[in-house]
């Protein structure tokens, strides 16, 4: 018998939907089911921090989870690394902090209010593990 592999795409900070998906997978494939998270973990949704924390906890517990980085995750990393809010890959010219991209929502989940600017960059670096 072959092992089932589950894939979860584009969570976008939707922690309640992530928990629902994890419960469904556990019912179908067991608590140690292999899951691949296909990136775009953060932005737009209400609780990117809870999504990141949940995935880190699962991996720390030894769950067979593979987490890939999506373009929204990369924009988050770029901001944390150097305060960059403009990506050359975004054709619209919108900054990562624009509500359509969701960076401000991600930072809000860490208790930060950037109000459209990057003055909270150092605070963000301290707040995110």
Label each PLM-derived region with a short phrase.
Residues 1-54:
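N-terminal active-site segment of His-dependent metallophosphoesterases
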Residues 45, 49-52, 56-129:
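Active-site neighborhood of divalent metal-dependent phosphoester bond hydrolases
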């Amino acid at each position: 018998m072959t092992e089932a592999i589950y894939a979860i795409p584009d969570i976008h900070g939707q922690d309640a939907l992530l928990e629902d998906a994890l419960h469904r997978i556990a019912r179908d494939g067991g608590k140690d089911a292999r899951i691949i998270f296909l990136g775009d973990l953060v932005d737009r949704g209400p609780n990117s921090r809870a999504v990141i924390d949940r995935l880190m906890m699962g991996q720390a517990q030894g769950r067979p989870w593979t987490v890939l980085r999506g373009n929204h995750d990369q924009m988050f990393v770029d901001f944390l690394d150097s305060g960059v809010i403009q990506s050359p890959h975004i054709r619209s010219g919108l900054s990562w902090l624009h509500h359509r991209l969701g960076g401000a929502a991600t930072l809000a989940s860490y208790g930060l209010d950037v109000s459209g600017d990057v003055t909270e960059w150092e605070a963000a670096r301290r707040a995110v593990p």
